[in-house]
Each structure stands twice: as C-alpha cells, then as structure tokens.
Amino acid sequence: MKFTRVCDRRDVPEGEALKVESGGTSVAIFNVDGELFATQDRCTHGDWSLSDGGYLEGDVVECSLHMGKFCVRTGKVKSPPPCEALKIFPIRIEDNDVLVDFEAGYLAP
C-alpha cells in the first residue's frame, strides 16, 4: 500500500468533511465522532462533490444536489436516487498526519 499525507487531523473538525486530491483522484475525508473515513468525493448519481455542500449527520452524508445519502464508513447507499455505492479508501493517522492510499479505493462487500 502506498499512503500519501493529505492533511493534518485538525484540518477536519468533528462533523465536517475535507476534499483532498492526488493524481487526479478526489477523496472526501469525513470526521465522525473523532474517527476519520475516506470515500470518493463525487456522488455516484449526479457527479457532485460530497465534501463541498454535502450534509454529514452521524456517519451518513447527504448529497446537496439530489439528496441521496451514503454511509461514509462503508460507502453503501442509504437513500436513493443513487444506486451505486461510493468507493472507500484506506486511511490511517500517524501522529496528527492523515494518510490515504489513493490507489487502493474499493467498493465494500
């Protein structure tokens, strides 16, 4: 696995999201009760940013374009209109550095 430093942990306040990019891949980092999760940033239904204008409630993000919802832990659709899950990305914290493996995005089983 190839992890890339994307931000400082303090850059993502609890209940918020931050968009990060590497090699043309955009990932949203979500802070859920102090735990960080990484998913693709674009909604699978309307190609809309989930980190910019999306609404995070617990571990569910709502797309601001058509109100579809996804679980940020699993990437799974929680409410239509989307029918395709989000890719999730391996993430780890070292000290306060947030690292993401942009090459290992996957769909949860």
Swiss-Prot record:
[2Fe-2S] cluster binds at residues 43, 45, 63, 66. Residues 4-100 form the Rieske domain. SUPFAM superfamilies: ISP domain. The keyword Transmembrane does not apply. Pfam families: Rieske. CDD domains: Rieske_RO_ferredoxin. InterPro entries: Rieske_2Fe-2S, Rieske_2Fe-2S_sf. One of its GO terms (molecular function) is 2 iron, 2 sulfur cluster binding. PANTHER family: 3-PHENYLPROPIONATE_CINNAMIC ACID DIOXYGENASE FERREDOXIN SUBUNIT, FERREDOXIN-RELATED. GO terms for biological process: catabolic process. The gene is bphF. Keywords: 2Fe-2S, Aromatic hydrocarbons catabolism, Electron transport, Iron, Iron-sulfur, Metal-binding, Transport. The keyword Mitochondrion does not apply. This dioxygenase system consists of four proteins: the two subunits of the hydroxylase component (BphA and BphE), a ferredoxin (BphF) and a ferredoxin reductase (BphG). Belongs to the bacterial ring-hydroxylating dioxygenase ferredoxin component family. This is Biphenyl dioxygenase system ferredoxin subunit. This protein seems to be a 2Fe-2S ferredoxin.
